[in-house]
Amino acid sequence: MDKRIEEVAAKALEKMGNDRYRLSLVVAKRAEQLANGATPLVDFDKNKNKLADIALYEIAENKITLEGLVETNR
């Protein structure tokens, strides 16, 4: 990805209805899943990129939602 992380974070925040708490919750949960072996839904190397950055890109690209994370934990 060639976007600056600030731009990606702003887009991800917009996707979460500008709710910073919700965004941080989704990023943390998705980063935990990635740390536990989940495959990134965007083209990133987990070993070369921060897991939180990967999660932000996934949210910004509509690959991950809070509702989707809740469903996978049930």
Curated annotation (Swiss-Prot):
Domain of life of the source: Bacteria
GO cellular component term, pick one: DNA-directed RNA polymerase complex
Reactions that this protein is recorded to catalyse: RNA(n) + a ribonucleoside 5'-triphosphate = RNA(n+1) + diphosphate
GO terms for MF: DNA binding; DNA-directed RNA polymerase activity
GO biological process: DNA-templated transcription
InterPro entries assigned to the protein according to its UniProt record, in alphabetical order: DNA-dir_RNA_pol_omega (IPR003716), Pol_omega/Rpo6/RPB6 (IPR006110), RPB6/omega-like_sf (IPR036161)
EC number(s) given by UniProt: 2.7.7.6
Record keywords, A-Z: DNA-directed RNA polymerase, Nucleotidyltransferase, Transcription, Transferase
Keyword Hydrolase: no
Pfam family, one: RNA_pol_Rpb6
Function field: Promotes RNA polymerase assembly. Latches the N- and C-terminal regions of the beta' subunit thereby facilitating its interaction with the beta and alpha subunits.
Family listed: Belongs to the RNA polymerase subunit omega family.
Subunit structure: The RNAP catalytic core consists of 2 alpha, 1 beta, 1 beta' and 1 omega subunit. When a sigma factor is associated with the core the holoenzyme is formed, which can initiate transcription.
Protein name: DNA-directed RNA polymerase subunit omega
Organism of provenance: Campylobacter jejuni subsp. jejuni serotype O:2 (strain ATCC 700819 / NCTC 11168)
Native organism taxonomy: Bacteria, Pseudomonadati, Campylobacterota, Epsilonproteobacteria, Campylobacterales
